[in-house]
């Protein structure tokens, strides 16, 4: 059962002014050498009515003094018993450590709360770990003085390298600088890798300080290293990294800025191309081509075009080639708005490369290209499968075959390209074999074949029509058409056909 004093101590946040020292001592709210002790918040106490400190700080002080009565009071006020251990270590109160140590599963958990290096080392000794563990934790919690104290222990390059890497990754700058200046390292340039990985400007500047001021041996060509840094910074869009690197050497060239292009970092492009004028016109043209290849954003493409004043005569053909190869036609949209029309050569290239209909469909929708134009272009290239895929997507019902049939016949009649006509006629004949035509329509199709000198299709269809009424006189009509059109091969075949009864 709780006593009245316990209840008062735990829940009394406002001490009456009438409480004198005797009453406070009776309630257990008096701290010897300090005065009255009052809880004012969940995590803070009021000492002698004029000093506010955290509950844990009060607990640390009480433990260092060995005042168990105050310790118990503060623990009842939700103080962290870790601070009992810290205070006990500071005051060499090992009886308290023995009493409360059983509640500590791992003394490493306390290290983050310790500010004093000596106390830190004492606490670590309670863990019974080796020196490597102490050094590792000293780095983790920024205890440089511990590393300096045990400098003679740090003689192996590989172990030192591990500590250096830990310090870099933990961003403990003072320790990084001290290790770099003092110890032998296996891979000192690890600091730069970490700086770029974590985008840590402080690490970068420390790295250059070690490299140039302390002559850190990186066993690499400096020019190559600085160029590598510029490329990494450009790829990440870190302009300040680039400017810091340039203080020590290096050159911003096409290779460097191409990294910025690949990742759409326009601020870097604008700084070095417009303000610093680092590149020739030819280099800017090549950057534009690189941007096309890497599917750069409209803003990046527009920026590069603006540096060229939208004059692309020297690279028009290359632009078309890069668009066709990469498949991204954003640049074509931008150029068309500036009255530079490259739609035709690009569409021709897409057809040559046999891009999927889905891709082509988006392109023709973007540039409002009529389907008939696409079919004719594909026919001229002999892309029969592409035309079939296109028609299957556009006309999904079997009833649409008649519509397709008429469309293709009209296209043949308006085409001059011989190979294109042949491609479409092959498709027309395929459709004929899948639909039903009346006798009159069959004769019309035969005339169509004769007019366009489609001998193979004509003879194939004649086999189907041979027994139809009126076929023989119709063949003579076809002969007249072939003679008028001057199709020698067709004439010869019709003459042979007309001899059969």
From Swiss-Prot:
Induction: Expressed in the early phase of the viral replicative cycle.
Keyword ATP-binding: no
Tree of life domain: Viruses
Keywords carried by this UniProt record: Early protein
Pfam families documented for this protein: DUF249
Family listed: Belongs to the asfivirus MGF 505 family.
Function: Plays a role in virus cell tropism, and may be required for efficient virus replication in macrophages.
Stated name of the protein: Protein MGF 505-4R
Organism in which the protein naturally occurs: African swine fever virus (isolate Warthog/Namibia/Wart80/1980) (ASFV)
Taxonomic lineage of the native organism: Viruses, Varidnaviria, Bamfordvirae, Nucleocytoviricota, Pokkesviricetes
């Amino acid at each position: 059962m709780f006593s009245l004093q316990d209840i008062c101590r735990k829940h009394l946040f406002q001490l009456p002014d009438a409480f004198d020292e005797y009453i406070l001592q009776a309630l257990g709210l008096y701290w010897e050498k300090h005065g009255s002790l009052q809880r004012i918040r969940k995590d803070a106490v009021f000492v002698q009515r004029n000093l506010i400190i955290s509950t844990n700080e009060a607990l640390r002080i009480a433990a260092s003094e060995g005042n168990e009565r105050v310790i118990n009071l503060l623990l009842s006020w939700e103080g962290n018993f870790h601070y009992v251990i810290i205070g006990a270590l500071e005051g060499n109160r090992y009886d308290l450590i023995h009493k409360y140590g059983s509640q500590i599963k791992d003394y490493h958990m306390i290290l983050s709360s310790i500010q004093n290096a000596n106390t830190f080392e004492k606490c670590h000794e309670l863990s019974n770990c080796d020196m490597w563990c102490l050094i590792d934790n000293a780095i983790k919690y920024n205890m440089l003085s511990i590393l300096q104290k045990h400098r003679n222990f740090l003689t192996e390059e590989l172990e030192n390298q591990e500590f250096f890497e830990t310090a870099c990754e933990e961003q403990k700058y003072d320790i990084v600088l001290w290790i770099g200046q003092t110890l032998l390292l296996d891979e000192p340039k690890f600091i730069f890798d970490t700086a770029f990985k974590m985008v840590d400007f402080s690490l970068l500047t420390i790295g250059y300080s070690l490299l140039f001021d302390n002559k850190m041996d990186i066993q690499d060509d400096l020019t190559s290293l600085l160029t590598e840094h510029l490329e990494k910074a450009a790829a990440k869009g870190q302009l300040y990294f680039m400017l810091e690197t340039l203080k020590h050497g290096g050159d911003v060239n096409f290779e460097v800025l191409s990294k910025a292009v690949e990742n759409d970092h326009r601020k870097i492009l604008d700084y070095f191309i417009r303000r610093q004028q680092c590149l020739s016109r030819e280099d800017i043209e090549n950057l534009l081509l690189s941007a096309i290849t890497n599917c750069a954003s409209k803003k990046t493409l527009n920026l590069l075009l603006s540096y060229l004043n939208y004059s692309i005569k020297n690279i028009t053909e290359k632009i078309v080639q890069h668009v066709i190869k990469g498949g991204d036609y954003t640049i074509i949209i931008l150029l068309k708005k500036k009255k530079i029309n490259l739609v035709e050569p690009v569409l021709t290239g897409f057809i040559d490369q046999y891009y999927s209909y889905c891709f082509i469909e988006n392109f023709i929708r973007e540039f409002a290209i009529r389907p008939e134009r696409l079919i004719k272009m594909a026919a001229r290239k002999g892309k029969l499968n592409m035309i079939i895929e296109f028609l299957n997507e556009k006309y999904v019902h079997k009833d649409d075959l008649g519509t397709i049939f008429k469309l293709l016949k009209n296209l043949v009649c308006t085409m001059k390209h011989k190979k294109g006509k042949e491609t479409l006629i092959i498709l027309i004949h395929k459709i004929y074999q899948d639909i039903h035509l009346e006798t009159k329509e069959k004769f019309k199709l035969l005339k169509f074949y004769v007019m366009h000198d489609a001998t193979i299709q004509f003879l194939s269809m004649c086999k189907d029509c041979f027994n139809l009424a009126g076929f023989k006189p119709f063949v003579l009509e076809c002969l007249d058409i072939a003679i008028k059109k001057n199709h020698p091969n067709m004439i010869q075949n019709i003459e042979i056909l007309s001899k059969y009864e």
